[in-house]
Amino acid sequence: MQLTELIETTVVGLGYELVDLERTGRGMLCIYIDQPAGIAIEDCEKVTRQLQHVLTVENIDYERLEVSSPGLDRPLKKLADFERFAGSEVVITLKKPLDGRKSYRGILHAPQGETIGLEFEGKEGAAMLDFTLADMDKARLVPKVDFRSRKQ
């Protein structure tokens, strides 16, 4: 079983989604998890403990294991991510430029089959970009932070 498959099986088995996995040159393994209710430190601890056991049993070599939430600017990689975050503001970077432009920021529309829509502000007003996962280099949520809503 490959490392990604092993980790995803473990994470999903605990009730979380594997958002991303990074393995650095110095033996560090970074795992990013999520769930609809968000991630708390206890969730990270639970996944860390389970993965430590699984990686030891499977004899996977690593120096350090880090489990965390994907953050406010969560990457979107799977079609299910685009469905879940439809209506959210995102930044999309395409692999190849379209009309001389690779990066777009706008409101995500729910996928229609394999096609994903992004409503953005073009040169002549509101415009729509239709793309597929194959067209996309990367996509991230735009963080929304409201400091004024704090209670006094």
Curated annotation (Swiss-Prot):
<dbReference type="Pfam" id="PF02576">
    <property type="entry name" value="RimP_N"/>
</dbReference>
<comment type="function">
    <text>Required for maturation of 30S ribosomal subunits.</text>
</comment>
<dbReference type="GO" id="GO:0005829">
    <property type="term" value="C:cytosol"/>
</dbReference>
<dbReference type="GO" id="GO:0006412">
    <property type="term" value="P:translation"/>
</dbReference>
<comment type="similarity">
    <text>Belongs to the RimP family.</text>
</comment>
<dbReference type="Pfam" id="PF17384">
    <property type="entry name" value="DUF150_C"/>
</dbReference>
<dbReference type="InterPro" id="IPR003728">
    <property type="entry name" value="Ribosome_maturation_RimP"/>
</dbReference>
<dbReference type="InterPro" id="IPR035956">
    <property type="entry name" value="RimP_N_sf"/>
</dbReference>
<dbReference type="GO" id="GO:0000028">
    <property type="term" value="P:ribosomal small subunit assembly"/>
</dbReference>
<dbReference type="InterPro" id="IPR028989">
    <property type="entry name" value="RimP_N"/>
</dbReference>
<dbReference type="InterPro" id="IPR028998">
    <property type="entry name" value="RimP_C"/>
</dbReference>
<keyword id="KW-0963">Cytoplasm</keyword>
<keyword id="KW-0690">Ribosome biogenesis</keyword>
<protein>
    <recommendedName>
        <fullName>Ribosome maturation factor RimP</fullName>
    </recommendedName>
</protein>
<dbReference type="InterPro" id="IPR036847">
    <property type="entry name" value="RimP_C_sf"/>
</dbReference>
